[in-house]
Amino acid sequence: MNAIDGTSRQLKDTEDQTLDDTPSLLSIIIDAHVPSWEEIKSQISISEAVASILVFINAHLALHNSNSVNVIGYNASGARILYPPKSGVESTRSKEREERSESVSDGEQAPSKKDHSMYRQFKTVDEVVQTELWNMLNHTNYVEEEKQHNSAISGALSLALGFINKHVFVDESRMRARILLLTVGHKNETIQYIPTMNCIFAAQKLKIPVDVCKLGPGSDQVFLQQACDSTHGIYMDISEKNSKTPKGLVQYLLSGFISDPSLRPHIVLPTQSNVDFRAACFLTKQVVDIGYVCSVCLCIMSQIPSNRRCPTCDTTYSEKTLAGLGRKPLKKKKKKVVKP
């Protein structure tokens, strides 16, 4: 448990705060990029990770009878909602189960089920999530995924925010919302820096915490760290370099991410000691230390555009302005001190 102990965070004075019994909407985003999972298959497989996520979902639903969940999968081909299913699918399946149970006449024994003792809501979520996720994986062009090596993480965040906006803010339901992103870490995720940051700003405005659980040995994702920091979420890197093993994913999920946002001021949570706040270049999509900023739209560039136009607002820069940017800073000559 020392791996998730946030000793750097001090407990806040919350004596005047009162807890309420408000239900919570949890939107879980699952990375379904198969080539990335193949790189860490010796540590954990995608089926094992999904099993841990389902245990976490059931624990969330068990905390409050009005809690709800939304599951989204994404890969290089795009993002799609896995749960809840399309309208009518879940209700039809529930009716079929009820009809089968009611069709048993008096004096007859009902047919035994493999998971008869399982809570119906847990069973429904487990079946739908697994079925929809495997359908998504089976209909994915893996040849194209190998070539692209990127993901639709911004599209998945947009789906999650849209679902939350519809079921929490538009319907005016008395419910809190948060997002949990399970990612393996892709080499070219910085390509989606701009649309992802737009989603982060939207979540920050709506006061929706974004939690990130990163698996694998890859480097930390800069914009995901920024997302957790700006939305008061939790960022946890589960990899061997941090003395953590993905084999214990269910333990990390239940220990670090199960707490409701209303309870987080009262407990010690995993913290980020070093957050990289550098931005990404709008041209090369790479993180930069020093760059140029457009005076019109604040676009960040690591190099001067060859066509002398801003890649975002299409503003044309004058040659005089660009010539001044290419010059090295002038050094003041030191005056010689003449000794008397």
From Swiss-Prot:
- Describe its function: Component of the general transcription and DNA repair factor IIH (TFIIH) core complex, which is involved in general and transcription-coupled nucleotide excision repair (NER) of damaged DNA and, when complexed to TFIIK, in RNA transcription by RNA polymerase II. In NER, TFIIH acts by opening DNA around the lesion to allow the excision of the damaged oligonucleotide and its replacement by a new DNA fragment. In transcription, TFIIH has an essential role in transcription initiation.
Q: Which InterPro entries match?
A: TFIIH_Tfb4/GTF2H3 (IPR004600), vWFA_dom_sf (IPR036465)
Q: Which GO terms describe its biological process?
A: nucleotide-excision repair; regulation of DNA-templated transcription; transcription initiation at RNA polymerase II promoter
Q: Which family does it belong to?
A: Belongs to the TFB4 family.
What's the name of the protein? General transcription and DNA repair factor IIH subunit TFB4
What's one GO-annotated cellular component? Answer: nucleotide-excision repair factor 3 complex
Q: What is the lineage of its organism?
A: Eukaryota, Fungi, Dikarya, Ascomycota, Saccharomycotina
Q: How does it assemble?
A: Component of the 7-subunit TFIIH core complex composed of XPB/SSL2, XPD/RAD3, SSL1, TFB1, TFB2, TFB4 and TFB5, which is active in NER. The core complex associates with the 3-subunit CTD-kinase module TFIIK composed of CCL1, KIN28 and TFB3 to form the 10-subunit holoenzyme (holo-TFIIH) active in transcription.
Does the entry feature the keyword Repressor, yes or no? no
UniProt region (Disordered), positions on chain: 85-117
Species of provenance: Yarrowia lipolytica (strain CLIB 122 / E 150)
